[in-house]
């Protein structure tokens, strides 16, 4: 649950008043602008994902797999784990549904500021739109080994209880997020690899049903 909510893969009006850093390197500014333009143009997106959870106190890695569907219009997201367990998180406007083992909970995000902010940044992290949210993150972007890598650190203290750093890896050609890495204060790390990414495809409305 915690990983699904923080993805993000990402998330914030809050109590802190720390300023965010504004990039001054022209190359960094252009990378952020290019990613934001691409993310803003995405009408819909669907993909498979593999999530690897590394706990600081254990050597074993927990690997799970699932599917994700996103639609920009109406702010809709479907995040579903398929193995080794089943869990579904659906965001549709101001409503969130969480379903596990046949039990379903529905939350109205309009009455829960933190949940609303987390859900919004979760979507923006998956598409890359979070890079321009200067009130939320200290952001650095660089080109490295044929990839674009963005490092985001939350500036508001209530977000740091979920993660201390987010790293997003982008395919420079498509300007799409292909990897999300979440680092927690405890030393735990979650890596999400997005695969078989398809954009601007028709997605059945059933995936966004909240009931």
Model-inferred region functions:
Residues 5-14:
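Bacterial N-terminal signal peptides
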Residues 18-22:
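Boundary at the C-terminal end of the N-terminal hydrophobic targeting segment
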Residues 40-93, 98:
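N-terminal mature ectodomain segment of secretory-pathway/periplasmic proteins
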Residues 46, 76-78, 88-90, 95-97, ...:
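General beta-strand recognition
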Residues 50-52, 73-75, 82-85, 94-96, ...:
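Solvent-exposed coil/turn segments that connect beta secondary-structure elements
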Residues 60-65, 86-88, 104-106, 163-165, ...:
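Short, mixed charged/polar active-site loops
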Residues 98-124:
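Acidic/charged, solvent-exposed loop-and-adjacent secondary-structure segments enriched in E/D, K/R, S/T
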Residues 107, 130-211:
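Gly/Pro-enriched, hydrophobic low-complexity segments
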């Amino acid at each position: 649950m915690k990983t699904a909510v923080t993805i993000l893969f990402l998330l914030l009006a809050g109590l802190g008043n720390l300023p965010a850093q504004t990039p001054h390197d022209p190359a960094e500014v252009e990378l952020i602008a290019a990613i934001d333009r691409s993310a803003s143009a995405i009408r819909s997106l669907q993909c498979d994902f593999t999530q690897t959870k590394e706990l600081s106190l254990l050597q074993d890695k927990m690997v799970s797999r699932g599917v994700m569907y996103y639609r920009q219009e109406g702010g809709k997201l479907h995040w579903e784990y398929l193995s080794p367990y089943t869990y579904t998180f659906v965001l549709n406007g101001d409503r969130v549904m969480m379903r596990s083992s046949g039990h379903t909970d529905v939350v109205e995000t309009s009455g829960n500021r933190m949940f609303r902010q987390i859900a919004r940044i979760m979507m923006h992290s998956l598409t890359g739109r979070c890079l321009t949210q200067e009130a939320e993150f200290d952001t650095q972007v660089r080109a490295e080994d044929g990839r674009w890598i963005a490092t985001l650190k939350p500036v508001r203290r209530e977000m740091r209880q979920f993660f201390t750093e987010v790293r997003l890896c982008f395919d420079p050609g498509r300007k799409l997020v292909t990897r999300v890495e979440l680092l927690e204060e405890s030393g735990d790390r979650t890596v999400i690899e997005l695969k078989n990414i398809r954009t601007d495809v028709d997605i059945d409305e059933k995936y966004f049903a909240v009931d």
